[in-house]
Design a protein with these regions (language model features):
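Sec-dependent signal peptide recognition
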Residues: 2-7
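C-terminal motif of bacterial Sec signal peptides marking the signal peptidase cleavage site
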Residues: 13-15
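Bacterial signal peptide processing site
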Residues: 17-19
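Tryptophan-anchored aromatic micro-motifs
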Residues: 27-65, 125, 145-171
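A composition-driven surface/loop motif
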Residues: 30, 55-58, 73-74, 102-106, ...
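Short, hydrophobic/aromatic-rich segments at coil-to-beta transitions
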Residues: 49-57, 71-76, 95-103, 122
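N-terminal glycine/threonine-rich, aromatic-flanked beta-hairpin/loop signature
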Residues: 62-99
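Extracytosolic low-complexity repeat regions of secreted or lipid-anchored proteins
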Residues: 113-150
């Protein structure tokens, strides 16, 4: 009896192991499947491919603003670690699907691709060395991860750096 139960249990587990399809590990992002797709369809989470990136984003003392401009979007970033350790800058952001190409105006060579995840913007963990010129002391923009607080252009346009300069404008 115990043996028959063990065999039946193994067969049930084997049936739960998936359909035999291999996961796409080529680096190409496919359409969301399973739970994520169901959540997007139900409206529980926003579809990053169809969401506007405009808004004010934050986490703790990290702030990002994104506003539309004539040709793309303007982005402003301010990160404050205290003790005069901060980063700040403005630039241009262009979007292709879930990828955001960020270029800071003040610094040649400070451009990189970030991710847009519906209501979050995530910078890569490693940025070009030139981006460190936007920062004082040991502060860094690498790995910045912020969530949207507001979709309002007027709120996003009010973000300032540590010296009181506006980082985003509402257009060119």
């Amino acid at each position: 009896m115990k043996r028959a139960f063990a065999i039946a249990s193994m067969l049930l587990l084997a049936g739960c192991w998936g359909s035999g399809k291999q996961a796409d590990t080529s680096g190409n992002a496919a359409a969301p499947i399973g739970l994520e797709a169901a959540a997007i369809e139900a409206g529980v989470i926003p579809d990053p491919k169809n969401s506007d990136i405009t808004g004010l984003y934050a986490r703790d003392t990290d702030r990002v603003c994104v506003v539309p401009s004539a040709t793309a979007y303007r982005i402003g970033v301010f990160v404050d670690y205290g003790d005069q350790q901060n980063c700040g800058g403005s630039g241009v952001i262009t979007r292709v699907g879930e990828h955001l190409h960020v270029e800071f105006d003040q610094i040649d060579g400070c451009s990189f691709d970030a991710r847009f995840e519906g209501d979050r913007i995530v910078f890569p963990g490693r940025l070009p060395d030139a981006c460190q010129k936007l920062c004082l002391r040991r502060a860094s923009l690498a790995g910045l991860d912020v969530s949207r607080l507001s979709e309002s252009v007027s709120e996003a346009s009010t973000l300032r750096d540590g010296k009181g300069r506006l980082l985003c404008s509402s257009g060119d």
